[in-house]
Regions:
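Extracytoplasmic/periplasmic substrate-binding proteins
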Residues: 56, 258-336
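Extreme N-terminal segment that seeds HTH/winged-HTH DNA-binding domains in transcriptional regulators
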Residues: 1-27, 31-36
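Extracytoplasmic/periplasmic solute-binding protein
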Residues: 196-241
Length: 449
């Protein structure tokens, strides 16, 4: 009985996620559903009724059953959301084999079980369970994991996520394009001025949009903020807002100056997906990247022809050697009603076999030490570069609410598009607005205490 219910649930959800059924569409008739799924209509009707209760479908008397608008935002039991990741088909295969009751989502934006990136998890931590009890129960061999990586994700005394894979960020570059431009190969101790000289040399041969991946997103500009010695917040400080500190402003100004140097006409870079394709095809020169990026590159038809190398992100004068942590973290939402399944899911994802497999694909560095040792090759120049950057990793986003996350990502992203000489003034305005927001939030918290 249960297997039939799982089969029809998968069938119906796949109709939605493949686009065969859209919001407002009427479900096919009983005869077609029975024929295509191979399950009796009695079982189909039971699953449909459950999905009606879950807000996926709605039944209209004398008209039939229809797909709800906005079904993608519903959170279904026994679902795993990681829809933006490039290896989702392989993960689906692994989970389906051992835990067939879990549906791996392609289009649902949230699941009971999820992989989330670092800055998103910090800002939405209160939506997730404390996983420390699960970690201690499921992984008694805890010395076989990079335990220090758990510390950043303990917020208000609770472990909101377990790093599944992680990586420092470096600067990837294409040796062939450097050679053709007559540009010296960069070295790990290069300065910001060295980097700008490199940009100018590359501009002789390469279109500005193909020199480096310049984007407004947090995980781009944050690299120069931390390399300049800046940060976003310091929760323990009397004034925790550091967006308008001199170091942070310097990093943002440098990032804006890079845009101005590349695009003096006021335009911006290529869309992220377009640049990634250009880089994979060997037509773009440099990219800020964690090891996860290598997996995407390998999927491109021209991957074997790339002459890839890696170097530390340049350090501005007076800055610090720092590399922002990039991680995919396993999380469980608070509305999980089946922790047994959660434990089984965690055991599978952090098993030696699964960690070994994804480590060897080049997708990040596994959280399991033995898998990381197998994945990182000492005779591979890029792997050695990622290894040497691990001690430099920092993770001090310290953005602990969705509202604050939106203020920072949208606000600072907009700053980066301003003329560089206006960055300081507008950073102070943004920081003051955030201070007001934090005071209001603190006041409300005291009133409800």
């Amino acid at each position: 009985m249960e297997n039939k219910h799982i089969r029809i649930k998968e069938y119906l959800l796949n109709l939605l996620e493949s686009g065969q059924l859209k919001g407002g569409d009427r479900l096919p008739g009983a005869r077609r559903l029975t024929k295509e799924s191979g399950v009796s209509y009695t079982h189909i009707q039971t699953v449909i009724e459950t999905l009606v209760q879950n807000g996926i479908f709605e039944t209209v008397p004398r008209s039939g059953t229809f797909v709800q608008q906005g079904w993608q935002s519903r959170i279904l039991p026994a679902t795993f959301a990681c829809n933006i990741l490039p290896w989702i088909d392989k993960l689906d295969e692994i989970i389906r084999k051992d835990l067939p009751q879990i549906h791996v989502c392609r289009k649902f934006t949230k699941g009971i079980f999820e992989f989330r990136v670092t800055h998103y998890l910090f800002s939405h931590h209160d939506e997730y369970l404390d996983l420390m009890p699960l970690f201690k129960e499921c992984f008694p061999d805890e010395e076989n994991y990079f335990l220090k990586l758990l510390n950043p994700f303990i917020v208000d005394g609770k472990l909101c996520g377990i790093p599944w894979i992680f990586s420092p960020r470096i600067l990837l570059y294409n040796r062939r394009l450097f050679r053709e431009a007559g540009c010296p190969i960069p070295h790990d101790n290069w300065s910001w001025d060295d980097f700008l000289t490199t940009v100018d040399l590359l501009k002789r041969k390469i279109a500005p949009g193909q020199i480096i991946d310049w984007q407004q997103s947090l995980h781009y500009w944050i690299n120069l903020v931390v390399r300049s010695g800046g940060s976003l917040f310091e929760p323990a400080a009397e004034d925790p807002v550091k967006i308008d500190s001199s170091e942070t402003i310097r990093g943002l100004r440098l990032y804006a100056e890079l845009r101005e140097r590349l695009f003096p006409d006021g335009s911006a870079g290529l869309p992220q997906d377009v640049f990634e394709n250009e880089f994979a095809a060997g037509r773009a020169a440099m990219a800020f990247a964690p090891r996860q990026y290598l997996y995407k590159l390998k999927l491109h038809p021209s991957a074997q022809e790339l002459e890839l190398a890696g170097v530390s992100i340049p350090t501005p004068e007076g800055g610090r050697r720092a590399s922002m942590l990039a991680a995919d973290l396993f999380c469980i939402r608070k509305n999980c009603t089946d922790m047994r399944l959660g434990r089984e899911c965690a055991k599978l994802l952090f098993s030696e076999a699964v960690q070994d497999y994804f480590g060897k694909t080049g997708y990040g560095i596994p959280f399991r030490r033995s898998s990381a040792q197998k994945a990182l090759k000492l005779d591979d120049e890029l792997d050695v570069k990622f290894l040497t950057e691990i001690p430099q990793m920092v993770y001090d986003y310290n953005i602990f609410s969705p509202e604050l996350y939106a203020l920072v990502t949208d606000g600072v992203g907009a700053l980066c598009l301003l003329p560089s000489e206006k960055i300081a003034e507008e950073a102070h305005r943004l920081a003051d607005a955030i201070r007001i927001f934090l005071r209001i939030k603190r006041s409300r918290k005291l009133q409800t205490a």
